[in-house]
């Protein structure tokens, strides 16, 4: 269970830890999904050890990632002066991050080969999400 708790802590800390990495490697869709893949693997390993379903923990990891990332972007929101962007950002990125983490988890639960498919799917979804948001 310690591995699952570490996964939740990683989900909470990841956006801050990834900030400098994403400045040098401008591929947030790949980098963020790779970290979430590590979190999902941690949860799946814990699930196999404990023989208990941890889908709620996986969902919570996606939510914690969302909240942490959104808090980091509060500075930009304050600079724009439009404070209603924060709940909108939480709503949009919440769906993205919880959705992609659940996709990887659901496809990788039974066989680790499903993780690869889930990861590629998550990266593609994240990439097109970023393009869509940039166009708003």
List each model region and its residues.
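Hydrophobic alpha-helical segments at protein termini of multi-pass membrane proteins
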Residues: 1-136
């Amino acid at each position: 269970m310690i591995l699952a708790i570490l996964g939740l802590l990683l989900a909470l800390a990841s956006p801050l830890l990834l900030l400098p990495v994403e400045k040098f490697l401008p591929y947030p869709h790949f980098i963020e999904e790779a970290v979430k893949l590590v979190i999902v693997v941690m949860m799946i390993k814990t699930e196999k050890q404990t023989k208990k379903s941890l889908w709620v923990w996986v969902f919570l990891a996606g939510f914690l990632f969302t909240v942490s990332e959104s808090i980091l972007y509060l500075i930009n929101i304050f600079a724009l002066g439009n404070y209603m962007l924060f709940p909108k950002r939480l709503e949009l990125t919440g769906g993205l991050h919880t959705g992609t983490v659940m996709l990887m988890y659901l496809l990788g639960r039974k066989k680790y080969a499903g993780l690869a498919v889930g990861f590629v799917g998550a990266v593609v979804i994240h990439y097109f999400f970023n393009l869509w948001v940039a166009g708003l």
